[in-house]
């Protein structure tokens, strides 16, 4: 074939199917490599490479050979449908919101800002750093569907914490009809049975969701991603990858180079160090940070959004947030607890005296460690002491540290065992008393509670005692911690979010404090112990105090009380954290900006030092820290505005006044032409359609989540009524293991795309439908053309429809082209 007949943007036919050339490379022998996107029914949406030296039957689609065939349908229905389908399947170029309003969520304009901001950038990349509970997952979904509508969201990978893979996957499907294949341990096992050993799952499945730890720890997956490229990568809770020297950070930096668009989300996007935050910004835009590493707000403001609840001005949106109620449950320590803590205080004072004499801090840190463990529970403190005793017994030699003094450890152990044997745990008694006062007995109609505790030993201790004291079956209390497998975590979170769950109390470690939705059917949370980090405390409280909580969130703190000097101060320092978190919640919106350390471990150390100095005013002092990020994010002048344009929406081109009319005509046409049988499709009412999952459709939709795909001969229920879809989501939460029965009816739904491609296929590529209309001037013909220019990846950068009027003599009407979109 001649060398000059192939060019980018050209349509070709090969092996009986049609393709659009996105790139042309010259082979060593003068032949060509044609990179192409499939556009006919069987290959639509897939990428191919043709070697003209091998495929010598490639022909170009010649528009001059097009035959005009009269549309004889009533009202030219087929012509209208063909034009509308072409328009809906085409990609648009716009800096405004076009398709997201059709998805199933309550639209709040502040949620549009990340996408609007990203669309203005040469590469759409954005950090969504909104505060806890503002709906960052919805904001990410808006970005994804808008990019898909622009032809830049075919291949998507989402990285999330293993505990929320299923939660994120459901949100994307239920609200946006984005099918993400979940690659947790169960999903990986499933695809191993489907794919050959050497098959790259990221090439087989276009849209996936996986834990970054799975990628990090699986050498084969690392090999796969090195050979893959994505249109969009989403990294949820991106603060976990901020350290580029860690395995996670190194992997995230690599992945940021394997995609075009990038979305990072985190309510705590930095740890207070400029270098750490610069690592995140460099993933978004490497040139944003000056080479010197010294940057300011002006350098990075295009690449992030950050708002808090207090910044949301729309009253209708604020109504989705309920004002929380704080309940402090003071617990008077028992004599046995006081005896233990006085012993601990003596150890602390002796250690402080030793520090003044030049000794190390080891003894002080040991005394604080057992204090912190005891504030979680006597059981947790006993587990720590027992572990220490075993280490000392097996050590070849002991040091002079208190923690290595066997007699001290045995004395501590004896006092803790005494507390437990006498059932003298005042905090547990207060918890039990509070539950009884609230009328709670663990029955199915009783309120659900989330309990947070730092130590796994405390979690197990609480489960055992609550089950015994309330005579509860094992299924009534669940406990969640980081040692559970990804599937166990997903199943537990999913079950607790269902109305028919039998779990009445879910006891969680801080592994559940990030990103997990626990507010469905639960509005009561108890901090059984108080974390020594405001960031952790804020994240805990945000599990039930978040967007979409329809009841008043009740947050309980169990606070130990004592009048013993020294101990009283230590306990008051810990209690001050709860007051300061509440102050920050009401005013700043960001608890991390109080200490300005932006790192849980650093905040815990800050509290340790406050106890050492007996400084009850430690939370009022902020001087001397390296990087005051509140200057960047906290002040009014730095906050992202709810909208960055007065008119954020652009209505997509359509020749149908309502979507419902288009879908009605589409399915009537497919049935009347015999392309599908009447039993496959059923329009129950305007905007509500039932589609049977036929063997053919099931094969096309192979990459849908198994939970979302009906069995063969069962039905999809699609509706344009967003309220109905949202009710279906709520109904699904009432029953374990179910996804929403209704799905959103719009052109991005995979099943709808399949039926629109069938309509397109009903008109041969060398045919153009012709229709008569009295609205056009006499002796003229008007042609509708679609023009598209793509980049090297096959992504459209220009796409528009034009109407060209031609007179009988061949001249243009007024020599003008009319853009349909304008």
Regions picked out by a protein language model, each given a short descriptive name:
Residues 41-116, 120-124, 136-139, 145-248, ...:
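SF2 helicase/translocase NTPase motor core
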Residues 74-78, 84, 92, 551-742, ...:
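C-terminal accessory region of SF2 helicases/translocases
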Residues 197-198, 203-204, 209-230, 241, ...:
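Inter-lobe coupling linker of SF2 helicases/translocases
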Residues 218, 272-273, 507-522, 541-549:
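SF2 helicase motor core recognition
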Residues 229, 276-279, 516-529, 554-557:
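A short beta-strand element within the Helicase C-terminal
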Residues 321-332, 369-505:
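Conserved Helicase C-terminal RecA-like lobe
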Residues 350, 696-822:
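Mid-to-C-terminal oligomerization/interaction "stalk" domains of large proteins
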Residues 533-555:
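Conserved SF2 helicase motif VI
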């Amino acid at each position: 074939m001649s060398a000059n007949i192939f060019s980018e943007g050209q349509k070709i036919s090969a092996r009986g199917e049609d393709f659009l050339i996105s790139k042309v490379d010259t082979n060593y022998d003068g032949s060509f490599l044609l990179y192409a996107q499939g556009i006919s029914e069987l290959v639509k949406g897939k990428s191919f490479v043709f070697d003209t030296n091998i495929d010598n039957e490639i022909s170009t689609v010649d528009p001059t050979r097009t035959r005009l065939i009269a549309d004889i349908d009533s009202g030219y229905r087929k012509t209208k449908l063909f034009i509308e389908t072409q328009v809906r399947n085409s990609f648009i170029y716009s800096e405004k919101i076009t398709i997201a309003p059709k998805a199933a969520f309550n639209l709040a304009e502040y949620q549009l800002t990340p996408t609007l901001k990203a669309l203005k950038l040469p590469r759409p990349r954005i950090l969504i750093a909104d505060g806890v509970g503002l709906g960052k997952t919805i904001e990410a979904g808006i970005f994804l569907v808008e990019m898909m509508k622009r032809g830049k969201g075919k291949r998507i990978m989402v990285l999330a914490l293993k505990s929320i893979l299923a939660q994120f996957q459901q949100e994307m499907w239920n609200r946006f009809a984005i099918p993400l294949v979940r690659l947790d341990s169960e999903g990986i096992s499933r695809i191993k049975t489907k794919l050959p050993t050497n098959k790259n799952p990221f090439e087989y499945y276009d849209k996936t969701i996986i834990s970054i730890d799975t990628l990090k720890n699986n050498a084969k997956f690392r090999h796969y991603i090195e050979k893959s490229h994505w249109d969009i990568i989403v990294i949820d809770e991106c603060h976990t990858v901020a350290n580029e020297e860690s395995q996670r950070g190194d992997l995230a930096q690599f992945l940021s180079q394997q995609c075009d668009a990038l979305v990072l989300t985190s309510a705590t996007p930095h740890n207070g160090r400029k270098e750490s935050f610069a690592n995140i910004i460099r993933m978004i835009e490497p040139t944003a940070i000056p080479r010197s590493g010294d940057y300011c707000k002006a350098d990075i403001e295009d690449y992030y959004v950050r708002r808090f609840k207090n910044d949301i001005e729309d009253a209708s949106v604020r109504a989705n947030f309920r004002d929380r109620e704080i309940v402090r449950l003071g617990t008077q320590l028992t004599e046995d607890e006081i005896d233990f803590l006085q012993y601990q205080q003596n150890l602390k004072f002796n250690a402080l005296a030793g520090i003044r004499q030049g000794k190390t801090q080891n003894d002080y840190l040991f005394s604080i460690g057992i204090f912190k463990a005891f504030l979680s529970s006597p059981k947790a403190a006993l587990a720590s002491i027992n572990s220490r005793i075993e280490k000392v017994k097996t050590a070849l030699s002991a040091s002079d540290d208190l923690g290595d003094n066997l007699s001290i450890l045995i004395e501590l152990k004896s006092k803790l065992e005494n507390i437990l044997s006498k059932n003298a745990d005042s905090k547990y008694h207060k918890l039990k008393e509070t539950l009884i006062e609230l009328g709670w007995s663990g029955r199915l109609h009783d309120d659900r509670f989330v309990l947070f505790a730092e130590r796994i030993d405390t979690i197990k201790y609480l489960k055992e005692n609550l089950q015994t004291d309330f005579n509860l079956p094992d299924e009534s209390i669940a406990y969640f911690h980081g040692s559970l497998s990804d599937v166990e975590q997903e199943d537990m979170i999913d079950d607790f979010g269902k109305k028919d769950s039998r779990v009445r109390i879910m006891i969680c470690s801080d592994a559940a404090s990030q990103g997990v939705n626990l507010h469905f059917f639960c509005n009561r949370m108890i901090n059984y112990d108080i974390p020594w980090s405001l960031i952790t405390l804020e994240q805990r409280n945000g599990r039930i105090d978040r967007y979409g909580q329809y009841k008043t969130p009740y947050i309980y703190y169990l606070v130990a009380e004592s009048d013993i000097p020294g101990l009283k101060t230590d306990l008051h320092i810990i209690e001050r954290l709860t007051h300061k978190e509440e102050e920050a919640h009401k005013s700043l919106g960001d608890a991390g900006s109080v200490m300005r350390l932006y790192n849980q471990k650093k905040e815990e150390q800050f509290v340790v030092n406050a106890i050492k100095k007996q400084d009850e005013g430690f939370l009022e002092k902020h001087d001397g820290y390296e990087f005051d990020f509140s200057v960047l994010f906290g002040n009014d002048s730095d906050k992202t505005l709810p909208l960055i344009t007065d008119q954020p929406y652009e209505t997509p081109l359509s020749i149908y006044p309502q979507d419902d009319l288009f879908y009605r005509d589409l399915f009537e046409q497919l049935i009347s032409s015999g392309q599908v049988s009447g039993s496959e499709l059923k329009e129950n009412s305007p905007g509500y359609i039932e589609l049977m999952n036929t063997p053919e459709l099931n094969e096309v939709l192979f990459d849908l989540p198994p939970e979302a795909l009906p069995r063969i001969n069962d039905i999809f229920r699609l509706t344009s009524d967003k309220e109905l879809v949202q009710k279906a989501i709520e109904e699904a939460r009432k029953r374990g293991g179910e996804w929403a029965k209704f799905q959103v009816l719009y052109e991005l739904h995979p099943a709808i795309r399949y039926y629109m491609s069938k309509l397109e296929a009903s008109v041969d590529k060398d045919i153009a439908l012709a229709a008569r209309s009295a609205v056009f001037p006499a002796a003229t013909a008007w042609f509708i053309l679609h023009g598209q220019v793509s980049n090297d990846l096959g992504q459209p950068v220009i796409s528009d429809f034009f109407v060209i009027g031609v007179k009988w003599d061949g001249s243009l009407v007024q020599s003008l082209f009319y853009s349909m979109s304008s």
